[in-house]
């Protein structure tokens, strides 16, 4: 049961980190 909830959490973290990087990289370019 713990593993079932742990896997989606790790995936969400990876996606969140990717979005944060893209937002930081392209967000600055778009704003500038």
UniProtKB/Swiss-Prot annotation:
Location within or outside the cell: Secreted
Summary of the tissues where the protein is detected: Expressed by the venom gland.
Protein name (record): Hyaluronidase-Pk1a
Keyword Kinase among UniProt keywords: no
Reaction(s) the record says it catalyses: Random hydrolysis of (1->4)-linkages between N-acetyl-beta-D-glucosamine and D-glucuronate residues in hyaluronate
Family that this chain belongs to: Belongs to the glycosyl hydrolase 56 family.
Molecular function as annotated in GO: hyalurononglucosaminidase activity
Residues carrying a glycan: 23
Organism: Phoneutria keyserlingi (Brazilian wandering spider)
Hydrolase as UniProt keyword: yes
Miscellaneous information on this protein: On the 2D-gel the MW of this protein is: 37 kDa.
Major subcellular site: secreted
GO cellular component, one term: extracellular region
Keywords: Disulfide bond, Glycoprotein, Glycosidase, Hydrolase, Secreted
Biological role: Hydrolyzes high molecular weight hyaluronic acid to produce small oligosaccharides.
EC number annotated for this UniProt entry: 3.2.1.35
Domain of life: Eukaryota
